[in-house]
């Protein structure tokens, strides 16, 4: 019997926090059965960076790829989940004891965003020198349980740019509280948004072995 899939996505409703100033999430029934005679039809309004989502390079680089141009293979396949104990930053020192050999997709639990009904004021961030360190091991995707890989006040977004330079894609806003460290199969496909800078995903893990 295969292991069950574990949902690691944030639930999307009107209570989900968004970046200050960004588009709030809303869902409403635009057309109900009484009006249509047959079906309910809903309408969603949201940012491309609400909840669990991927960043396309166009998010931080005007010349970068859009969501539709991304290789779907990046978001499906073996992944390693690691736990860090509420670090101030996520850098080489924090990962030195972690075996990364053969890891293509690295998902990091920090436990730093405990109340997901409010947007955090500060978060641990990816230290840019970590990017070439991960590239050396062949990592192509990094996922975190935070809304960004950079400090929330950053305008230069050094981690975004350095990860991109090293060919490492970004998955943000994961829910990993209920996931033990180890090796899993990941599925976190973006929507086929032609011009978008990011996309919500339904991310899930299945224990390997």
UniProtKB/Swiss-Prot annotation:
Disulfide bonds: none annotated. Signal peptide: none annotated. It holds the Pfam family Cyclase. It catalyses: N-formyl-L-kynurenine + H2O = L-kynurenine + formate + H(+). Pathway: Amino-acid degradation; L-tryptophan degradation via kynurenine pathway; L-kynurenine from L-tryptophan: step 2/2. Keywords: Hydrolase, Metal-binding, Tryptophan catabolism, Zinc. The keyword Cell cycle does not apply. Binds 2 zinc ions per subunit. GO terms for biological process: anthranilate metabolic process; L-tryptophan catabolic process to kynurenine. Its cofactor is Zn(2+). Zn(2+) 2 binds at residues 55, 160, 172. It comes from the Bacteria. Belongs to the Cyclase 1 superfamily. KynB family. Catalyzes the hydrolysis of N-formyl-L-kynurenine to L-kynurenine, the second step in the kynurenine pathway of tryptophan degradation. This is Kynurenine formamidase. It comes from Geobacillus thermodenitrificans (strain NG80-2). The gene is kynB.
